[in-house]
């Protein structure tokens, strides 16, 4: 059994490709793949990433400081679509 990371290498290091990865996972599960038991998404309130600034008051709330992330709305849509199609 396997849990698939939709980001990092599976998205070619581009967080915006996570939707393509979850679509492929959806197709695999729909086709009968029983090996996949879960997935991981890089997600935050708002998309993208930012550097940690000395003056943290200048930083944007809800944007990752580590890996680039999809936003909350896209996260909800991807998960709802997965649930609807498996």
List the model feature ranges, each with a label:
Residues 1-86:
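Expand to "…catalyze enediolate/carbanion chemistry for C-C bond making/breaking, isomerization
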């Amino acid at each position: 059994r396997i849990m698939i990371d939709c980001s990092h290498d599976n998205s070619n290091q581009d967080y915006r490709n996570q939707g393509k990865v979850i679509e492929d996972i959806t197709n695999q599960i729909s086709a009968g793949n029983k090996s996949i038991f879960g997935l991981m998404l890089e997600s935050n309130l708002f998309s993208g990433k930012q550097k940690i600034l000395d003056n943290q008051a200048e930083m944007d709330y809800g944007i990752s400081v580590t890996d680039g992330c999809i936003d909350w709305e896209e996260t909800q849509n991807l998960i709802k679509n997965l649930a609807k199609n498996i």
